[in-house]
């Protein structure tokens, strides 16, 4: 299982410890996304920044499309299935399965670990970016609904 974490809010007025945690997660700008494994270390970091990000469990299809559409190599070069198979020696589906299982981290591959996304088409659907998802906003844990949001942002 892996989490997709998307930064929703900016950096103005953020406490120092939360800003440091965002840097550790590589979430430097709004609409940046990282895919991280589910473990105690990352779970604690996500809980600390939950008022500035949204997160949930990413599925295989969304991860494959995220890698192919928004994945980049050093020098901002786009990825293709052939290039990825040559560099990682795995097809995209197998790479996505291993990332979801926690066997491989994206930072261990030539793919940049941060996906730069567009703002969501038609917005966040609900009460804005200052409220939690459970009460109608965009922040915090959203379980499988993160896949819908990522598809709107690709």
From Swiss-Prot:
| Record's GO cellular component terms | cytosolic large ribosomal subunit
What Gene3D superfamilies does the record point to? 1.10.15.30, Ribosomal protein L30, ferredoxin-like fold domain (3.30.1390.20)
InterPro entries documented for this protein: Ribo_uL30_ferredoxin-like_sf, Ribosomal_uL30, Ribosomal_uL30_arc, Ribosomal_uL30_CS, Ribosomal_uL30_euk_arc, Ribosomal_uL30_ferredoxin-like
GO biological process terms, alphabetically, are: maturation of LSU-rRNA from tricistronic rRNA transcript (SSU-rRNA, 5.8S rRNA, LSU-rRNA); translation
Task: Look up keyword Nuclease and say if it applies.
Answer: no
What family does this chain come from, according to its entry? Belongs to the universal ribosomal protein uL30 family.
**Oligomeric form and interacting partners:** Part of the 50S ribosomal subunit.
Q: What is this protein called?
A: Large ribosomal subunit protein uL30
């Amino acid at each position: 299982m892996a989490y997709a974490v998307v930064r929703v809010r900016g950096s103005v007025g953020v406490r120092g410890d939360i800003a440091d945690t965002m840097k550790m997660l590589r979430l430097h700008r709004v609409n940046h996304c990282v895919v991280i494994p589910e473990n105690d270390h990352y779970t604690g970091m996500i809980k600390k920044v939950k008022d500035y990000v949204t997160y949930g469990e990413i599925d295989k299809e969304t991860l494959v499309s995220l890698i192919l559409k928004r994945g980049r190599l050093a020098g901002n070069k786009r990825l293709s299935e052939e290039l990825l198979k040559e560099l990682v020696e795995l097809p995209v589906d197998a790479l996505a399965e291993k990332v979801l299982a926690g066997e491989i981290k994206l930072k261990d591959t030539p793919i940049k670990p941060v996906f730069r996304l567009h703002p969501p088409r038609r917005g966040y659907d609900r009460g804005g970016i200052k409220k939690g998802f459970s009460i109608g906003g965009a922040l915090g844990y959203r379980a499988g609904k993160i896949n819908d949001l990522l598809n709107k942002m690709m």
